[in-house]
Amino acid sequence: MTSLNPVFKIGMQISEMILAHESISKEEARLRSIEMLRAVGIPDPEKRMNDFPHQFSGGMRQRVMIAIALACNPSLLIADEPTTALDVTIQAQILELMIDLKQKRQDAAILIITHNLAVVAETCQRVIVMYGGKIQEIAPVKELFNNPLHPYTQGLLNSIPRPGREQHRERLRAIPGNVPSIMNLPVGCKFCTRCPVKIDICDTVEPPLVEITPGHSARCHLVKPVYEFSAGVNTNE
């Protein structure tokens, strides 16, 4: 929402993007801008076209950014931390808006980049977990939350407060250590310096991304043997 230029009117910023990508007249771009503001729930869009960003609340500016992103009808909307700096109520409204717009555009998809696992659980169908610039786990959202395979994913989920945890006096478990510098990553597994189940090979050999079950992949030397053992398969054969 800080991407809006504070010295230009909202309508000009939406129209400019449309004119940069499509061969249409300024009037057509203006009319589409009004329609996009209406689509994202901005009241009285014809009037608000002439307002400046400082005249909008944080949530309304986020809606304007979504309108700009969707104005040329893209097949993929990339939303990078779409709820950052918004209060919980406005976060819910923005997520509901994005889901609603996605449902109305059956041929479109939304890629959400976020650290907020509540946002992931609420909006996503499929999840890619990344650490150190590498994909560590891929799974359908329910599968990921119910059966996380990678130690990093498990650490993320264990650090989330849950209802009823206080009754069992269960402490939150933070991931130990610090995130390594992207300029000096470990040679082997990128998570090995913080992993509670690390073995020797993790320091020197980066594990491949392996499909463990249909649609569920993980990058860990221990995951496949552990899963096979838990499934009743003799890994020594």
Residue ranges: model-predicted function:
Residues T2-L4, M12-E28, R38-I42, Q55, ...:
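ABC-type ATPase nucleotide-binding domains, specifically the catalytic core motifs of the NBD
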Residues I14, I66, I90, I94:
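Hydrophobic anchor residue at the start of the ABC signature
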Residues E28-K47, D100, Q154-L157:
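Conserved ABC ATPase "signature" region
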Residues D51-F56, M60:
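Conserved ABC ATPase signature
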Residues A71-S75:
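A short, proline-enriched helix->beta-strand linker immediately N-terminal to the Walker B motif
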Residues I78-P82, L86-E170:
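P-loop NTP-binding/switch modules centered on Walker-like glycine-rich loops
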Residues P140-E237:
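Charged, flexible cofactor/metal-binding loops and thiol motifs
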